Amino acid sequence: MPASGGKTAPPPGSGPGGPVRLTWVQPEDLVGHEFRQAAEDGRGETAEPLLRVWLAAGGHLAPARAGASPTPAPPELRALATDLLTALAALPTPAEPAARPDPAGHGAARAPGSSGRPLAPGRGGAGTRTEAGSGVGGRARFAGPRADAAGDGPALRRRLEAAWLGRAVGCVLGKPVEKLPLHGIRALARAAGNWPLGDWFTERGVPPEVLAAHPWNRRSAPTSLAENIDGTPEDDDLNYPLLGLLLLQRHGKGFTTADVGRLWLDELPAGRTFTAERVAYRNLLQGLEPPATATHHNPFREWIGALIRADVHGWTNPGAPAAAAAQAHRDAALTHTGNGAHAAAFVAAATATAATGRADVHTALRAGLAVVPPRSRLAEAVRFGIRAAADVRDTAAGFDTVVDLLHARYGRYHWVHSVPNTAVIAAALTHADGDFTHSVCRAVSGGWDTDSNGATAGALAGLIAGSPDAIPHRWTAPLKNRLATTVPGFDGIGFDTLAHLTAQEAARS
């Protein structure tokens, strides 16, 4: 995500004495992103007259990579942006094809712009019904009995520790190059003799002109290069699994979407949220209820934020991909709809399958796809990524070809959108075929949201590895079994302790 610990660079004028200029919430920036979302979800033609009004008034398109445009809009332009956001929300959205009907009826989806009434308090076991925002993704159904959770006890705890470690490794690996374009990532790694990517990024040996052309993520480089990693730095890709664990400790697997919102208000600093999460947080403070928190003036509702919250739902439902997907959808409904929620369900189901200790990575990915509407944009992208990765030889050079294909096909999306990022995660895991190092390195070398992709791929690859000892020491040693976070009660915690706490929640009914 764009991302951790306030990683998004502040716009000019936002330093001491300047305006606050909070990112990801300014109407003049949100409306540009909503026009982009409209083009993606089938409203582009009907939105065109509104776009002409916006541009004629002096408005701009969405910032390509930053969270805010360089300067604030004048009051009249900001008011117009707010009005246009409301008008865009009223445009009918062509629905994507629905998932196949399922008698259990988990996770019935809700269309964009639907009523802001609170979600029905679903109880997330098999045979129950939960509601989640769907955007344009059609009706997502999560069905099936809970499978026997193989390997409970010590074996499950070892897998969970490997998953937590894998998530941390992949996240930290991707942090220095987050927001960089693909050619910049490749240039930095090649200059260090680290391409194909196989180790931590480093500044050692990189010529000054390369560093000047492709500067590291300025917030992450001091804590995430090979020469300075000293424990696991804070990141939203690690904060959200902690919050998910806290959610389950307080409310159990029957939590409601409203429970998620209350937990955030109690325990999550607003400044540690980004994109859809920040907009939803603002909506909560304005008195809106889910699912309106996910839809009201939230152009980021199909981005990657719900996906990075999904692992804990899979970890705590080993062998029960349907239940994991239903939990993830209920969590996602606070902030995301459509493909954003589908991505969370995909990861949760794949993770739950891998958590048994009996499935290979390809079986896990198939389980993830089984809970996604098969004709949604997300399912199409994941299938494309898997096919592309399966069609090339299992070498890093071959994966460069896969990445080039993905960027050619999905480069129109924002770099934080769920569709391209889920595709590259699936492609990386497929190509790596269960190898931990290859999984995280392929995911990060694919570009886009590098720390989120590395984290998700690393978590699933850790489960497949089955034990912390199966992850190469060069990855785990610098993290020192220590995680920094602003989530209360967790700062400095070890991954072994997190595995124990997660296993306790997995054992709860």
Where are these regions (language model features)?
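Surface-exposed loop and adjacent secondary-structure segments within mature catalytic domains
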Residues: 182, 190, 195, 206, ...
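Long amphipathic alpha-helical scaffold segments
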Residues: 72-154
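Long, charge-dense tracts
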Residues: 1-101, 107
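Aromatic-rich carbohydrate-recognition surfaces in CAZymes
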Residues: 221-260, 264-273
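Catalytic phosphate/nucleotide-handling subdomain of diverse soluble enzymes
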Residues: 169-175, 179-197, 336-339, 345-353, ...
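An N-terminal structural lobe/cap that precedes and organizes the functional/catalytic core
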Residues: 112-116, 122, 138-165, 169, ...
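C-terminal domain-closing interface element
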Residues: 214-233, 397, 494-509
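Accessory "access/gating" subregions that flank catalytic or transport cores
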Residues: 107, 139-152, 277-304, 308-324, ...
